[in-house]
A protein has these predicted regions:
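Bacterial N-terminal signal peptides that target proteins for export
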Residues: 1-9
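Conserved, well-structured interaction surfaces
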Residues: 45, 49, 54, 89-163, ...
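Short coil/turn linking the two alpha-helices of tandem helical-hairpin repeats
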Residues: 160-162, 167, 204, 230-237
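Membrane-proximal, proline-rich intrinsically disordered regions
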Residues: 21-76, 246
Length: 246
């Protein structure tokens, strides 16, 4: 009888030990980078990051856009390539770079990798902005949403400036984009900037170390002026909005 009691007691103690160990293993992550809630500034930082970063892990890993050189696919670099490298303002020594001789010689076509990288970057960024706007509208203040709408307009502006057309979407859903070109894309940009300008922060609101680089109303005014100054070019002479640049 004593042996049965001892065996039963020992088994019970072992079970209690297993339960205790199991409870101790059920712990939450203490990794400060692993969390599911984000501040407004963190959410906005991801949107602004599309202007400089090329992927999820820095210079070379998990790129947003597949290419032979991830560093070539960033917004600033890919747009700069198509805006400046064929002008007298730039002398590019590395002519062996992919597609470079066609760019600097003003003889590129749709198969040039640099033309494709810029196109894909603008499309990728716009998709990110559409997702943010869709998810956060009604949750964040209007001025924060207007900031991201400005970033989206900036990318559409470069579509207009570089390609004269864009695969257009201003929503995040499963529908395919439609093509807007010339006058239609110009008018959308004109209306969008007119709408968001009064919603954005006052000029100079972010001139401090905490918010340096964020777009305020002045950024929208500048983009709108640049759009208006080139209105006749973008619309084949159908619209001449030069007065809006004043």
């Amino acid at each position: 009888m004593k042996k049965i009691f001892i065996k039963t007691a020992m088994a019970s103690m072992l079970c209690m030990g297993f339960v205790s160990c199991a409870d101790e293993l059920n712990i939450k992550s203490v990794d400060p980078l692993n969390h599911q809630t984000y501040t407004v500034e963190e959410l906005l930082a991801k949107q602004y990051a599309t202007l400089g970063l090329t992927g999820q892990k820095g210079p070379a890993d998990l790129p947003d856009i597949k290419s032979g050189d991830e560093g070539e696919t960033g917004f600033i670099r890919s747009v700069f390539n198509l805006e400046e490298l064929m002008t007298d303002e730039t002398l590019w020594a590395y002519q062996s770079n992919d597609g470079m001789t066609q760019i600097t010689g003003m003889n590129w076509d749709k198969d040039n990798p640099r033309v494709n990288w810029a196109y894909q970057r603008l499309s990728f960024d716009i998709n990110q902005y559409n997702f943010f706007i869709s998810e956060q509208s009604g949750s964040l203040s209007e001025d924060k949403i207007a900031e991201v709408r400005f970033l989206r307009a900036l990318n559409y502006y470069y579509f207009l400036d570089l390609y004269r057309k864009a695969p257009f979407k201003d929503t995040f859903d499963n529908n395919l984009p439609t093509e807007k070109s010339g006058k239609d894309l110009y008018e959308w940009l004109d209306n969008e900037l007119t709408t968001i300008e009064p919603l954005m922060a006052e000029v100079g609101a972010y001139n401090n170390s905490q918010n340096f680089g964020r777009a305020d109303r002045g950024a929208a005014y500048a983009l709108h002026a640049r759009l208006a100054l080139n209105s006749a070019v973008y619309t084949d002479g159908q619209i001449k909005d030069y007065q809006k640049a004043i």
